[in-house]
Amino acid sequence: MPLAPPANSVETMASLMPLSPYLSPTVLLLVSCDLGFVRADRPPSPVNVTVTHLRANSATVSWDVPEGNIVIGYSISQQRQNGPGQRVIREVNTTTRACALWGLAEDSDYTVQVRSIGLRGESPPGPRVHFRTLKGSDRLPSNSSSPGDITVEGLDGERPLQTGEVVIIVVVLLMWAAVIGLFCRQYDIIKDNDSNNNPKEKGKGPEQSPQGRPVGTTRQKKSPSINTIDV
């Protein structure tokens, strides 16, 4: 009965067997180099992920990207806890470091994770951040935002006028002043014409004779009438 070869002889035979063409050392080396380049080109995960401007139905998530990395976009995974509602927001060709989350349910718990998008793919997910939306009646105080937070201004806030707006207002005021001045000038001209025509009409009266009597008028004298009756 033939005896099985020892373990060391089996390893020796396996080492002497030719490798398959698909597993040649050259191919393995190229694959390992390619994987190394892809991993090197992927951006790192975002840092300092925070959620601010909490509202009943919206919030704002912001993050930072380590310097020296090429980032062309971001991907945000939003998940509602204890309920359906998963959303992925993806945007490329942008350098923004903040995103508004909308359509949230009030008084609910959510988690978000941010990924950076580079030329060779996405980074690993950043830290998971938990937040809770407010109730419909709750409002944040006006001084709750820190200097580094992204501010969202309402439409009713005071805003200084821009240069273009000031120019438009000045032009409109000048046009109104010109129209009012033209109207006043035309009114003065019409008033002067009326005042020049009235004295001529008032000076005209009935023509008078050299004796001071008006021409065309006769003075009738009344004489007593006498009636004679013959008997």
Curated annotation (Swiss-Prot):
GO CC annotations, alphabetized: endoplasmic reticulum; extracellular space; plasma membrane
InterPro entries xrefs: FN3_dom, FN3_sf, FNDC_type_III_4/5, Ig-like_fold
Endpoints of the signal sequence: 1-40
Glycosylation sites: 48, 143
Fibronectin type-III domain span: 43-136
Protein origin, superkingdom: Eukaryota
Extracellular side: 41-163
Cytoplasmic-facing ranges: 185-231
Reported phenotype of the disruption mutant: Knockout animals show no overt phenotype.
Biological processes, Gene Ontology terms: negative regulation of inflammatory response; response to transforming growth factor beta
Stretches the record annotates as Disordered: 118-156, 193-231
Keywords annotated in UniProt: Glycoprotein, Membrane, Secreted, Signal, Transmembrane, Transmembrane helix
Biased composition (Basic and acidic residues): 193-205
PROSITE patterns: FN3
Segments passing through the bilayer: 164-184
The keyword Transmembrane helix is annotated on this UniProt entry: yes
One of the Pfam families matching this protein, by short name: fn3
Tissue-specificity statement: Predominantly expressed in the liver and in the brain, including in the cortex, hypothalamus and hippocampus. Also expressed in heart, lung, kidney and testis. In the colon, expressed in the epithelium and in a subset of immune cells in lymphoid aggregates.
Protein name (Swiss-Prot/TrEMBL): Fibronectin type III domain-containing protein 4
Protein's organism: Mus musculus (Mouse)
